[in-house]
A protein has these predicted regions:
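Helix-coil boundary/capping segments in enzymes
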Residues: 1-176
């Protein structure tokens, strides 16, 4: 975007933009012993979904409504192939934002749910903490690191333990 365009454009700041985490987020970051129970995308007769600790969690069309007309919104499960690339790829998201006149976006999780509930409800607390940290590292370094200032991270916390939550705030704050 040119400086002239930026100065003359009327811009919005979105404070509630959900990101659809790409399939590699946890598989690239979790220790090997957790790969089989950590979040990963599976495809079976029922379609494509996240699998975490043996629980199958589909992504609905409502979570991937970006770029669609209201009448196309659907609560039915969707695949990554059905989604607009800007739902899960940061450079494409920034291009979509620029086209829509959005200067900055506060980025919220989707699969981890509100405040990282998916990991708060994990059977294995160690795995839950590692998933929280993996998500935050990805969100800060990879997603928001693509375009600092335009993509703003909303971290998640291990809400089951106040000391772990404080430590995660300090750890992520140190990342910038």
């Amino acid at each position: 975007m040119s400086a002239t365009h930026a100065a003359t454009q009327e811009w919005l700041v979105s404070v509630d933009d959900h990101v659809l985490e790409p399939p590699h987020v946890w598989q690239d970051r979790l220790p090997a012993r957790f790969k089989d129970v950590g979040p990963r995308i599976v495809t079976d007769d029922a379609g494509e979904a996240w699998l975490f600790e043996g629980k199958r969690i589909a992504t609905t069309g409502l979570a991937a409504a970006a770029g669609k007309k209201r009448e196309e919104f659907s609560p039915m499960p969707v695949t990554y192939a059905d989604m607009r690339e800007g739902c899960y790829e940061p450079k494409a998201r920034v291009a979509d934002m620029t086209k829509a006149g959005v200067l900055a976006s506060l980025c919220f999780p989707s699969f981890p749910r509100f405040c990282g509930q998916t990991f708060t409800e994990a059977d294995d607390r160690e795995l839950g903490l590692l998933c929280v940290q993996a998500y935050n590292d990805w969100m800060i370094d990879e997603w928001c690191g693509t375009e600092p200032g335009r993509l703003i991270p909303m971290i998640i916390l291990p809400l089951w333990d106040p000391l772990l939550a404080a430590a995660e705030i300090e750890r992520t704050a140190a990342k910038g």
